[in-house]
Amino acid sequence: MSHSKVAVIGSGNIGTDLVVKLKKLATNVEIAVLVGIDPSSDGLARARRMGIGTVDTGVQGLIEHAEFDEIDIIFDSTSAKAHLVNEEALRTFGKRLIDLTPAAVGPYVVPAVNLDDHLGAPNVNMVTCGGQATIPIVAAISSVTAVHYAEIVASIASKSAGPGTRSNIDEFTQTTSAAIEKVGGAAHGKAIIVLNPAEPPLIMRDTVLALVTDPDQNRIRQSVIDMVEKVSAYVPGYRLKQEVQFTQLDDAESVATLTGGVDKGPGLWKVAVFLEVEGAAHYLPAYAGNLDIMTSAALQVAERIAANTVQEATR
């Protein structure tokens, strides 16, 4: 099967890790060009050593590149504001965009949950690292019972957070909160990110808290386990930290502002799921699971889009 050529915009932590994954793991797509704006960046230097084409003049340089016409899919790993500019510049060329920033121009995509619904979208958004880790769990719970409120806390090593991540904190919380509702299925969602300065750096940890009514604990527990297995198929370091926990709330009134005022009486429970994500250490060390889950999910999306394009063409 012929490979779809792809380009990556952004030569920072995420973009460089994605390039390494594309080179090592991809089966349906082929990395052609890495695009940056700093000629001396480590990412561009590494790409050149790997025999990959590079551009150091941003998206305009990509458009002018000799291989641009052959490129089918473009990953954008810059920042939310930069993606808006890049998307506008690329809009008329008919390229498929996979957005790894919180810009959310296109629909939110979490591969284990809703990728099949958006294989034909011109621009898909990968939400955030915290979203990729936790939204599958919210979706697993909401597939069993109504989730009145879901809150996620993503704790990442400070050393793994580059300038793009740091400049997008507000966008991170807004985009993740919205996707918890739209993709995860929660009635109300909230996201919190913590940059942990601990030394040595700790791997990514994620907590999912959900408020539900009279839960079938066995069904929820099994649904979560099944979802973890689905995610770990493309993010091998993704795992449950401990058993799913259930706590009955004695005073449901205290959470009425979170649940939108529903189910204030007895029967309200808190479901707690604790996760950790260890990176594959393709570019950064294993503690950077937050980068690994984003790039692994994005690679999964590109592989499926490319395969689907071939299937559609042969029908």
Curated annotation (Swiss-Prot):
Belongs to the acetaldehyde dehydrogenase family. Keywords: Aromatic hydrocarbons catabolism, NAD, Oxidoreductase, Plasmid. CDD domains: ALDH_C (cd23933). SUPFAM superfamilies: Glyceraldehyde-3-phosphate dehydrogenase-like, C-terminal domain (SSF55347), NAD(P)-binding Rossmann-fold domains (SSF51735). This is Acetaldehyde dehydrogenase 2. Pfam families: AcetDehyd-dimer, Semialdhyde_dh. The keyword Transmembrane helix does not apply. The active site is at residue 129. It catalyses: acetaldehyde + NAD(+) + CoA = acetyl-CoA + NADH + H(+). The keyword NAD applies. GO terms for molecular function: acetaldehyde dehydrogenase (acetylating) activity; NAD binding. Its EC number is 1.2.1.10. One of its GO terms (biological process) is catabolic process.
